[in-house]
């Protein structure tokens, strides 16, 4: 089991799929990382040699991933809330940000229905 960016990658999966278990790396970026590190993307993680793992670590290190990315996103949201702009207010109230309707739907963002007292 290889450890990259503080994440244990699942040994039985292909490299490009396993890299996606790192927060901030999706399909496209994982394939590009494999290409730039010179690793075949369909190789299983358990079959990687130590130099290949080191090259992948170096390539992943060039990006903001995991805790640093989560922190950056949190800071950006906090900044919006402190500014008092529309998006910040929507974050604060736990409502959708991008113009979706809220009279019906938006249950994921708003949470479960609250019972109305009579």
From Swiss-Prot:
Q: Does the keyword Cell wall biogenesis/degradation apply?
A: no
Quaternary form?
Answer: Part of the 30S ribosomal subunit. Forms a loose heterodimer with protein S19. Forms two bridges to the 50S subunit in the 70S ribosome.
Q: Which HAMAP family match?
A: Ribosomal_uS13 (MF_01315)
Q: Which UniProt keywords apply?
A: Ribonucleoprotein, Ribosomal protein, RNA-binding, rRNA-binding, tRNA-binding
Lineage start? Bacteria, Pseudomonadati, Pseudomonadota, Gammaproteobacteria, Lysobacterales
Give one Pfam family: Ribosomal_S13
Q: Name one GO molecular function term.
A: structural constituent of ribosome
One GO cellular-component annotation of the UniProt record comes to: small ribosomal subunit
InterPro entries for this protein:
Rbsml_uS13_C, Ribosomal_uS13, Ribosomal_uS13-like_H2TH, Ribosomal_uS13_bac-type, Ribosomal_uS13_CS
- According to its UniProt entry, what is the function of this protein? Located at the top of the head of the 30S subunit, it contacts several helices of the 16S rRNA. In the 70S ribosome it contacts the 23S rRNA (bridge B1a) and protein L5 of the 50S subunit (bridge B1b), connecting the 2 subunits; these bridges are implicated in subunit movement. Contacts the tRNAs in the A and P-sites.
Gene Ontology terms describing biological process:
translation
Question: Which Gene3D superfamilies does this chain map to?
Answer: 1.10.8.50, 30s ribosomal protein s13, domain 2
Which species does this protein come from?
Xanthomonas oryzae pv. oryzae (strain KACC10331 / KXO85)
What protein family does this chain belong to? Answer: Belongs to the universal ribosomal protein uS13 family.
Would the keyword rRNA-binding be found if you checked this record's keyword annotation? yes
> Where are the residues of the annotated region Disordered?
94-118
Listed name of the protein: Small ribosomal subunit protein uS13
